[in-house]
């Protein structure tokens, strides 16, 4: 075995099998609980990412001022914007770090699902290589029941339900952290990403094991809940206005005050 299999893949396979044992012999429930645990461990990074996104939204008035002042000088504009981000402590890596960390988890989870749901003799023999000999509880569990709700966790979902859940939940999660931007070019890029990413993951749901798509749905829902309690509805302005109480004073924004000219 290589380092990837020893450090990541093999532990994940055994944890999912043991989790299925204690969760009514259901790999689907094991994936859901596993997702919750992963997101709980990543909570500090996720919170930092959300707060950085919120700061970026609050900085939009100052960024717009820079665009008006240095709009024609792209080099000076980039320099001033970088200085502003440095001043406020916002880093691009802080915004994308949770996504980068989750990518190896996606790969390992996909590989784990395809192995733990083995049914053929050769597949079961290959699975036995990954089981811990000292964990006697895992051997009677194999082969696992691959069915969860309407899904066969080892195969793509041929219905439209799971792709809609994946794409819809990802769109909501991304919309909440997408800052309002008056710059036409950046606004167009944000809108393109807001549309393309959910469509891409919805398409991938038709290609990969539905167990991985189940992880995406649960992870997106957890992200939506976290974002609501940490930063509010964010870019979902329509939903935020609809649920606001009439007559309730709004919190002051962090936009700089404009003082009258001196006499």
Which residue stretches match the model-derived regions?
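Helix-loop-helix
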Residues: 1-263
């Amino acid at each position: 075995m290589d380092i990837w299999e020893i450090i990541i893949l093999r532990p994940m396979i055994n944890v999912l099998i043991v989790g299925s044992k204690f969760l009514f012999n259901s790999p689907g429930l094991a994936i859901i609980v596993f997702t919750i645990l992963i997101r709980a461990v990543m909570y500090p990074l996720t919170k930092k990412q959300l707060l950085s996104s919120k700061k970026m939204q609050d900085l939009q008035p100052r960024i717009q001022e820079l665009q008006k002042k240095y709009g024609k000088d792209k080099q000076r504009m980039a320099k001033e914007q970088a200085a502003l981000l440095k001043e406020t402590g916002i880093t691009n890596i802080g915004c994308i770090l949770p996504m980068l960390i989750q990518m190896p988890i996606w790969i390992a989870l996909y590989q784990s699902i395809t192995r733990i749901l083995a049914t053929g003799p050769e597949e079961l023999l290959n699975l036995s290589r990954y089981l811990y000999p000292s964990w006697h509880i895992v051997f009677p569990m194999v082969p696992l029941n691959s069915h969860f709700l309407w899904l066969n966790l080892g195969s793509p979902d041929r219905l439209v339900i799971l792709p809609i859940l994946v794409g819809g939940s990802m769109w909501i999660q991304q919309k909440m952290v997408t800052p309002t931007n008056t710059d036409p070019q950046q606004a167009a890029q944000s809108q393109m990403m807001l549309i393309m990413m959910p469509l891409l993951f919805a398409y991938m749901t038709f290609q990969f094991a539905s167990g991985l798509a189940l992880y995406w749905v649960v992870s997106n829902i957890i992200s939506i809940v976290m974002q609501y309690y940490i930063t509010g509805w964010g870019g979902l302005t329509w939903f935020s206005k609809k649920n606001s109480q009439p007559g309730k004073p709004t919190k002051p924004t962090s936009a700089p005050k404009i003082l009258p000219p001196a006499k």
